[in-house]
Amino acid sequence: ICNMFNAELIGVHVGEKTNKKEADLQQILSETDALKKPIKTVWQEGEPVKVILNTVIEEQIDLLILGALKKENLLKYYVGSIARKLTRKASCSILLLIKPSIVRQACKHIVVNGLKDDKTEETIRTSVLFSKNLMCKKVTIVEEISQSELQVKVDDDKSLRKATIIKERLKNREDQRVKNILKGIDSEDISIKMQSIFGTRGYSIGHYAKIKRADLLVMNAPTNVGILDRIFPHDIEYILSELPTDVLIVK
């Protein structure tokens, strides 16, 4: 990823620096593609979340890459693993990897949220940038529409037809909104599809990314996530509790 973005890699190790750990790191690096820019390693003892968050600020990190468990159990969901805590507190964008590999696996399909939000344009722009740098030719923008917008109780053929018409109008509305965003983004040579889904935000796009076997899911960072959002999940919490694939959270 660093080579594709022509970026510097900064490794953060929380714990004591030893000769063995340095040797282990060099062994790992020797098994990967050579870096265009030399790696900088930060060795610091302390509480992992605090050390990493401070490093993000001090080193002016643009993207924090973390390994993450694919599915958290109930205890970890409420207590929060290191990766989840960093996701909520870091000031930069975050890439959560659930299937890291020494040998690069081609990225063939990126799914990105297209919900109506001030952050969405930047998120779509970032997904296109990643698509170009990862040489991915397929991007799907998912517009999640709440079922509450239908406001129709389907109990006969007439109400079913009415619901179908309303769904189509909502879909056209969302498609047009996303098309307006795409007018200002250079997406040449990328196949971009729009997909409207009616359902719960976060859960719906996560399920879609899973069944479509997307290689990367790109999401807006939540505006505010407190304890109530973790008890009554915010849309991003559905994604964090059971990662469907690698996830990029754009801040």
Where are these regions (language model features)?
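Small/aliphatic-rich secondary-structure junction motif
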Residues: 1-21, 32, 109-163, 182-188, ...
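Short glycine/serine/threonine/alanine-rich loop segments
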Residues: 6-7, 37, 61, 92, ...
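General small-molecule cofactor/ligand-binding pocket signal
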Residues: 10-12, 40-44, 95, 140-142, ...
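Short, surface-exposed alpha-helical segments at coil->helix boundaries
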Residues: 18-29, 171-179
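Gly/Ser-rich helix-loop-strand patches that form or flank binding pockets
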Residues: 53-103, 207-251
